[in-house]
Amino acid sequence: MLGLENKLKLYGFNNLTKTLSFNIYDVCYAKSEREQKDYIAYIDEQYNSERLTRILCDVTESIGAHVLNISKQDYDPQGASVTILVSEQTLAVKEIDASCNKGEIDILKTRDTVVGHLDKSHVTVHTYPEYHPDNSIATFRVDIDVATCGEVSPLNALNYLIGSFDSDIITIDYRVRGFTRDVDGKKLFIDHKITSIQDYIDENTLKRYDAMDINVYQSNIFHTKMLIKEIELQNYLFNRDVYEIKPKQRLEIENNLRREMIEIFSGTNIY
């Protein structure tokens, strides 16, 4: 069976574009508007552009690519974005465009904003904290895209990405576009076997989630959604202890959290 480790022999450069879109949702119970704002401020600090940059640099390394340029920004009142331009092979300094900062740390420390450019191979992340004063639940979404061309596969970064965030709901999309050719000139529209994104996720991780697939094999489109199975209430309380809450209210909070997760997972207003 051909997988990521079994490479086809190709003619010329591998022109396939592989794109992984990865969204995680973290849900929290914050009763008052003050608690909600404090949660958003906490999340905003925890996942600022500096930390996200480190995560994306690790992603770049895990897929076997090399950083050419980093662009990052923290937003007011909240949120952050990071974009990294990557290359499949190591490039000599003289081959790198003068506008690229190569991810040098000194540059990141001396500028609030680093502006660069994109290419076909890039890694991006955006964060979206959210709450409503009429609802006791706040959410935090991280949107990551890993797009590569050539032999580099973004699927290699999946387990690292899942482990980098507190994820109650995960949605993953993977698609392959373009074509390359084998040595005999035959077109190849995908260069590895894949039946499900779940095949690339650690078994211990999958045990913690209910997962479902929606795949369009003839179009090389793969989609997986994951919903956390067990709710440990203490992990969802912000600045509160579960023992301060009466048992009846605990059950109500758990039900509200589960309803919120189910609606996000299904993409539908159910309740």
UniProtKB/Swiss-Prot annotation:
InterPro entries: AdoMetDC_fam_prok (IPR003826), S-AdoMet_deCO2ase_bac (IPR009165), S-AdoMet_deCO2ase_core (IPR016067). Keywords: Autocatalytic cleavage, Decarboxylase, Lyase, Polyamine biosynthesis, Pyruvate, S-adenosyl-L-methionine, Schiff base, Spermidine biosynthesis, Zymogen. GO terms for biological process: spermidine biosynthetic process. Binds 1 pyruvoyl group covalently per subunit. The active site is at residues 121, 126, 149. Its EC number is 4.1.1.50. Is synthesized initially as an inactive proenzyme. Formation of the active enzyme involves a self-maturation process in which the active site pyruvoyl group is generated from an internal serine residue via an autocatalytic post-translational modification. Two non-identical subunits are generated from the proenzyme in this reaction, and the pyruvate is formed at the N-terminus of the alpha chain, which is derived from the carboxyl end of the proenzyme. Its cofactor is pyruvate. GO terms for molecular function: adenosylmethionine decarboxylase activity. Transmembrane segments: none annotated. The record marks 120-121 as: Cleavage (non-hydrolytic). GO terms for cellular component: cytosol. It catalyses: S-adenosyl-L-methionine + H(+) = S-adenosyl 3-(methylsulfanyl)propylamine + CO2. It holds the Pfam family AdoMet_dc. Pathway: Amine and polyamine biosynthesis; S-adenosylmethioninamine biosynthesis; S-adenosylmethioninamine from S-adenosyl-L-methionine: step 1/1. The modification Pyruvic acid (Ser) is found at residue 121. Catalyzes the decarboxylation of S-adenosylmethionine to S-adenosylmethioninamine (dcAdoMet), the propylamine donor required for the synthesis of the polyamines spermine and spermidine from the diamine putrescine. Belongs to the prokaryotic AdoMetDC family. Type 2 subfamily. Heterooctamer of four alpha and four beta chains arranged as a tetramer of alpha/beta heterodimers. NCBIfam families: SAM_DCase_Eco. This is S-adenosylmethionine decarboxylase proenzyme. It comes from Clostridium beijerinckii (strain ATCC 51743 / NCIMB 8052).
